[in-house]
Amino acid sequence: MIIAHRGISFDLPENSLSAFNASWAVGVDGIEGDFHLTRDGSIVCIHDDNTSRVCNKNLVICNSTLQELKELNLQCEGKDHLNIKIPTLTEVLKIVPSGKKIFIEIKCGVEILSPLIKELSRSKINSTQVVIISFDRQVVKELKEMAPEYKALLLYSYKEGREVSSLINEMFDIKADGIGTDNELSKEFVEKVIISGLEYHSWTIDNADTANQLISWGSNSITTNEPELLIQ
């Protein structure tokens, strides 16, 4: 599977509906977006915990209401895109086609899980279309306890150098369905993960040769900033 990292965002704001729709247009298998919880309990799609990098005003997400965030225009390369707003999870879910995937990266803590599960259950999205991902083991653990029907992956930087067996044991302890890592890893690492019965997913891969190598090793998905290149 080829997954568009924050959508296609070279000339469109990242994590915007426009960037996600551009991804569907080139034939990706899924999109990856980042999500935070607002002060008034809405779930919004934005990578950072504040708006300074992607808007012309700095608001902290968890201290802001949805209405306050919706007043901002998203930027790309320092330029405002008029009427391109920070989307809600509801808005993103509505544009996911049948049979396609959405990788939901949780960028805050476990406080998002209850509203997230409610939002997913109200949407047209089938549970098989959803993959929840997080660097926070507690988020993965509690998600699987609350809603085991959703696939959940623990994100991990291979450069941390941890023993594969220890990492696999942790995956089973928190009931994760698999692991997502960067691409600086060995074939042995991937094989051990897969042999254990866990899924292996790769991020963020923008080179076709690297992507093909990881696929040949058994990677279930490739998350990329260059979906058009990898689809060719």
What are these regions (language model features)?
Residues 1-232:
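Phosphate-group recognition and catalysis centered on beta-loop-alpha active-site segments
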